């Protein structure tokens, strides 16, 4: 341990103790909050089903930084490199298109065996896995509809894909001893003025009911549904709106997914967490950074990321909120993108754990809003960085920007050799 780091840590302990915070307890609590890293940052959402195919569904990965993963082995190696630079508990979030098979597999026929390598890798790296059906980048989603499709056979294909995905998810949970959160997001919508907004939603409602009809062990699998305001090519109407999925999750008691980029730019999901928690059993969060639209920029340690973390901690939602990330930037080093975004999420959680929430609640209840604002602002200047650096030290990860040196070395030795 460096003398400088140790001295900063001791001073930080004293400073936080003065406001009633036990920093050791904060670090213990931080180790209770895994962050689920998304595999698709590593290859720009290409997957292994048809890596040369185009990305559809109203989403875009922009940029052409060299060295993206071309197969599962490369993606896992890149993930390992990123995870070595991120302290504390982690999970991995997979999409169905990241299956491994020597022969083509129709999406409605995916099975646990197509993901056994991921499970073995997760066991070796002490990770939980989460899952997603992939209802995009496919000939049967080309017209913009999947689970709400008017064609019975096409709709059934996507229903069967989601049902098969649930079994894969349950397999993850059973094998790894931690439930897999499986999130359903569909791109269904229309570009222009829509006359019949009801019928597609009726079809989606019935389709989802069929998807979740098979009872699975909640210790292995958790269903989640995700809304969106609009996508490219679906600007005027989205079948799976916020109101639709809030109603669905409430009435069916599934988890609700809130994506930071899936709402109007003036809305924030941090304000939605406490409201949703009154009605749904669990929340899945997709922490992202929308720049003017759902652009999925790398997560920053900004006001909204901090507000999301604070909501989780202030209301003791550790066991009801699942923290996932969802961004994909192809314009920068993809491993660095993972490291920056995931470390920022964990920093936000630590800062929330170092807040004297009980004292702030008392001030708020007493109507002393002056003191509340004053203390909230003074809190920002307390030496949380020293606590973060100690946390990194204890988890054998770089405390500061030294991690970038490791990324650069990996880029030179590994990424630069990829075609």
UniProtKB/Swiss-Prot annotation:
InterPro entries: L-rhamnose_isomerase (IPR050337), Rhamnose_isomerase (IPR009308), Xyl_isomerase-like_sf (IPR036237). Its cofactor is Mn(2+). Pathway: Carbohydrate degradation; L-rhamnose degradation; glycerone phosphate from L-rhamnose: step 1/3. One of its GO terms (cellular component) is cytoplasm. Induction: Induced by L-rhamnose via the RhaR-RhaS regulatory cascade. Binding of the cAMP receptor protein (CRP) is required for full expression. Also induced by L-lyxose. SUPFAM superfamilies: Xylose isomerase-like. It holds the Pfam family RhaA. It is found in: Cytoplasm. Optimum pH is 7.6. Binds 1 Mn(2+) ion per subunit. L-rhamnose binds at residues 95, 226-228, 262, 326. Mn(2+) binds at residues 262, 294, 296. Gene3D superfamilies: Divalent-metal-dependent TIM barrel enzymes. One of its GO terms (biological process) is L-lyxose metabolic process. Keywords: Cytoplasm, Isomerase, Manganese, Metal-binding, Rhamnose metabolism, Zinc. In the crystal structure, RhaA appears to bind a zinc ion at a structural site. However, the metal ion may be different in vivo. Homotetramer. HAMAP family: RhaA. Belongs to the rhamnose isomerase family. This is L-rhamnose isomerase. It comes from Escherichia coli (strain K12).
């Amino acid at each position: 341990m460096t003398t400088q780091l140790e001295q900063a840590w001791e001073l930080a302990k004293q400073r936080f103790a003065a406001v009633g915070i036990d920093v050791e307890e904060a670090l213990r609590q931080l180790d209770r909050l895994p962050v689920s890293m998304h595999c698709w940052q590593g290859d720009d959402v290409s997957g292994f089903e048809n890596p040369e195919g185009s990305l559809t569904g109203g989403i875009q990965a922009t940029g052409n930084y060299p060295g993206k993963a071309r197969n599962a082995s490369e993606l896992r190696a890149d993930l390992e490199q990123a995870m070595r630079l991120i302290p504390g508990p982690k999970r991995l979030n997979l999409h169905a298109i990241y299956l491994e098979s020597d022969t083509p597999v129709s999406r409605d026929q995916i099975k646990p065996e197509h993901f056994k390598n991921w499970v073995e890798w997760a066991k070796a790296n002490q990770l939980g896995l989460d899952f997603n059906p992939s209802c995009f980048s496919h000939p049967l989603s080309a017209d913009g509809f999947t689970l709400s499709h008017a064609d019975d056979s096409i709709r059934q294909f996507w229903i069967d894909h989601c049902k098969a995905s649930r079994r894969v998810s349950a397999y993850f949970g059973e094998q790894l001893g931690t439930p897999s959160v499986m999130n359903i997001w569909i791109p269904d919508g229309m570009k222009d003025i829509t006359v019949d907004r009801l019928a597609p939603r009726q079809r989606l409602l019935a389709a989802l009911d069929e998807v979740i009809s098979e009872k699975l062990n909640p210790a292995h699998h958790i269903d989640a549904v995700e809304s969106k305001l609009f996508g490219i090519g679906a600007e005027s109407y989205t079948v799976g709106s916020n109101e639709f999925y809030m109603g669905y999750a409430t009435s069916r008691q599934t988890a609700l997914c809130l994506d930071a980029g899936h709402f109007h730019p003036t809305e924030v999901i941090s304000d939605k967490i406490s409201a949703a928690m009154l009605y749904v059993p669990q929340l899945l969060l997709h922490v992202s950074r929308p720049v003017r639209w759902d652009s999925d920029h790398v997560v920053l340690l900004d006001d909204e990321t901090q507000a999301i973390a604070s909501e989780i901690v202030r209301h003791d939602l550790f066991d009801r909120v699942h923290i996932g990330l969802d961004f994909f930037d192809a314009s920068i080093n993809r491993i660095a993108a993972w490291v920056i975004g995931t470390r920022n999420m964990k920093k936000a959680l630590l800062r929330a754990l170092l807040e004297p929430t009980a004292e702030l609640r008392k001030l708020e209840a007493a109507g002393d809003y002056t003191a509340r604002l004053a203390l909230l602002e003074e809190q920002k200047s307390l030496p949380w960085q020293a606590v973060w650096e100690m946390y990194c030290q204890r988890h054998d990860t770089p405390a500061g920007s030294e991690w970038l040196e490791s990324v650069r070395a990996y880029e030179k030795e590994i990424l630069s050799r990829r075609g």
